[in-house]
Design a protein with these regions (language model features):
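Short, cationic low-complexity segments
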Residues: 225-238
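Cytochrome P450
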Residues: 6-19
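Acidic/histidine-rich, surface-exposed loop or edge segments in extracytoplasmic proteins
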Residues: 17-27
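Short hydrophobic "helix-edge" motifs at membrane interfaces and signal-peptide entry regions
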Residues: 244-245
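Acidic/polar-rich alpha-helix caps and helix-coil junctions
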Residues: 1, 5, 25-221, 237, ...
Length: 402
């Protein structure tokens, strides 16, 4: 596993400590299920309202938003509640409720659809959304809450990667790259950040305002749990740390090594003010420093940072993997090396030569680059990798550094 937390029996963590958070009627499970299906319900309402043959540019745009969100939600659910797509197409997945069967499902319930049926719906929705976004002249402007055609390409690239449609995944990733901003530079990545949706590498985000309830609640928000230099759950001991083994595999020449404290609680990416705050809070070794506080203010209690849902860096990694697995491992390796050299580590050399070796090299870069962004677990499922809980920094009856 890539993210580590201390054993903290505090507040809502109690259920997790006693392994009671696995049942259907407990909050962690309910939150995921209800959030996805509530969004699907809303999306179904929009889809049922707008004529799919409309010539109105604004309506095309709004229909594309609903179809994209519905596809995103079902993609999350499909990955969470069944094994990965390939080899499991006929297995039961989640109930598939669309605008076409919503009334029937409300009255009589809805049986689980197969994995294939759910993915067919996901791809159908994304294909329609892409066509609509390509056909409309309405754009989101600078508001990255909304889905642009580049984000739709990115979503479809994710799904195609999971379905092992390598050529299509590469094509969509390249289209997303072509219409998006550039990745963070080494200089930009060399300081705590990842708080502003306006950053050029961000494609899609949850945009937060200071007046939002999630902020005024105080600590019930993303920065509270992920931030090490602001006020929140982390500052009372719920630190988010990196697996020591993964950290040790990051070269010293890679600017991302400073996204976490080392064994001596040092990071080259911190300035004097940030070092003082980390010391004051007592941040343990390997604590994350990737996410800075809102507006860069130390001990910030206004946790109004935006939340990244998609960055262009991911598209480069999808492109490299899809090229390699699609029959061109040397091209995939070159794409990966150029991305890392240009933006993260000028000394990096991708020595992988086979398709699967390049795929593993990409996975390693995904584990580092996208750490804390909600994709690591899905990668483990997609690639059929086990979850290795050794080197997790906690005291265990058996050796942990094997």
């Amino acid at each position: 596993t890539d993210m580590v937390g201390l054993d903290i029996n505090y507040n809502w963590f109690t259920r997790s400590m006693t392994f009671e958070d696995l049942f259907f009627n407990y909050r962690p499970t309910n939150i995921l299920w209800r959030t996805m299906y509530n969004q699907i319900y809303t999306a179904n309402g929009v889809v049922s309202t707008i004529d799919p043959a409309t010539e109105d540019s604004s309506l095309k745009y709004y229909l594309a938003q609903a179809l994209s969100i519905r596809a995103f939600d079902y993609f999350v659910l499909a990955q969470m509640y069944q094994h990965t797509y390939k080899g499991n197409e006929s297995k039961p997945c989640v109930p598939l409720i669309t605008n076409e069967n919503a009334n029937e499902a409300a009255a009589n319930g809805c049986a689980r659809s197969t994995v294939q049926e759910v993915y067919d719906q996901i791809m159908s929705d994304l294909n329609k959304a892409v066509s609509l976004l390509e056909a409309t002249d309405k754009t989101r402007g600078t508001d990255k809450r909304y889905i642009s055609k580049e984000v739709a390409y990115g979503l479809r690239a994710r799904v195609n990667l999971t379905m092992q449609n390598w050529t299509a995944a590469a094509e969509d990733a390249q289209k997303a790259i072509n219409g998006s901003g550039t990745p963070y530079s080494r200089e930009e990545a060399g300081a705590p950040g990842f708080t502003e949706s306006s950053d050029h590498s961000w494609m899609w985000a949850i945009v937060i305002a200071e007046t939002d309830r999630v902020v005024t609640s105080g600590i019930v928000n993303f920065p509270s749990h992920m931030g090490s230099l602001n006020y929140g759950y982390a500052s009372v001991g719920a630190w988010r740390m990196i697996n020591k083994k993964l950290y040790n595999e990051i070269p010293d020449t890679d600017v991302r090594k400073g996204w976490w404290l080392d064994a001596n609680k040092h990071s080259d990416n911190l300035n004097a003010t940030q070092v003082a705050q980390a010391t004051k809070y007592g941040c343990p070794a390997y604590t994350q420093m990737k996410y800075g506080p809102y507006k860069g203010v130390m001990a910030q209690s206004t946790n109004a940072s935006d939340i990244p849902l998609m960055r262009v860096e991911e598209m480069y990694l999808i492109l490299a993997e899809a090229q390699a697995m699609g029959g061109n491992p040397s091209t995939g390796a070159a794409t990966l090396q150029k991305f890392v050299n240009d933006y993260r580590d000028p000394a990096y050399v991708c020595t992988a030569s086979s398709a699967t070796a390049v795929q593993d090299a990409v996975w390693q870069q995904r584990r580092i680059e996208l750490w804390g962004e909600g994709l690591s677990y899905f990668d483990i499922l997609r690639l059929n990798k086990g979850i290795d809980r050794r080197c997790l920094l906690y005291t265990s009856p058996s050796p942990r550094d094997r």
